[in-house]
């Protein structure tokens, strides 16, 4: 007697592409600390332009932008009308916010399961295989997002700003040395640090010649002089 033919059942499955998204925000704070080069006194009334050198970009498939994109202009202030006049002030502040966003899409998968003795069993196995594949594809997309965010955070962990004095207060001059009137500063994310900017002061040279009032000839003997400068706090001339 011939053996009965066993019916075999198969089922195909297909897992569509999965998408994941992610984002983060950074802030960058800059506090100007304006001082005089030699005396270290605080300098009010200096106008400083601060601007991110790069304002937007793309990293690992995601994009970022900083706001405000343009320059911010600040003026130092904070002097107090007391004996600490020269020690207080020289302050100004500005801040920026950065946003990064990325979306990643996985590949697709498909397959076939079987044989099974019933179509119901084959369909159930196909559904299970499809669900497992979808979960893996979701993980694949999310891992890609996580990697992109990590790369972006590393790259944007500090950004450069133009830090430049545009208006010099009366009595001072621009300084072109270290921490001078024109700088490029690197600002770490999520900080609000002080950035020193120095001013030179006006300088002059005085040549004194002692002469005889009658002959007009220069007197060779030593002469002693005292030089005074005006103090804005006391309202008096003070010896230098």
What are these language model-derived features?
Residues 1-240:
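Solvent-exposed loop/turn and edge beta-strand elements of beta-rich ligand-binding domains
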């Amino acid at each position: 007697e011939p053996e009965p033919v066993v019916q075999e059942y198969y089922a195909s499955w297909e897992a569509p592409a999965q998408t994941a998204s992610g984002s983060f925000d950074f802030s960058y704070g800059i506090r100007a600390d304006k001082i005089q080069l030699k005396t270290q006194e605080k300098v009010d009334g200096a106008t400083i332009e601060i601007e991110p050198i790069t304002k937007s970009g793309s990293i690992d498939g995601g994009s970022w932008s900083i706001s405000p994109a343009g320059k911010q202009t600040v003026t130092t202030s904070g002097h107090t009308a007391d004996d600490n006049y020269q020690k207080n002030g020289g302050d100004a502040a500005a801040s920026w916010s950065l946003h990064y966003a990325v979306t990643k899409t996985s590949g697709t998968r498909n397959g076939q399961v079987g044989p099974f003795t019933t179509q119901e069993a084959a369909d159930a196995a196909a559904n299970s295989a499809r669900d497992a594949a979808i979960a893996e594809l979701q993980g694949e997309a999310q891992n890609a997002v996580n990697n992109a965010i990590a790369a972006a955070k590393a790259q944007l962990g500090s950004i450069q700003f133009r830090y430049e004095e545009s208006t010099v207060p009366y009595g001072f001059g621009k300084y072109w040395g270290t921490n001078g009137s024109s700088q490029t500063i690197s600002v770490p994310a999520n900080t609000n640090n002080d950035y020193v900017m120095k001013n030179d002061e006006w300088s002059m040279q005085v040549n004194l010649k002692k002469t005889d009032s009658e002959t007009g000839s220069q007197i060779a003997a030593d002469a002693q002089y005292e030089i005074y400068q005006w103090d804005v706090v006391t309202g008096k001339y003070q010896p230098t």
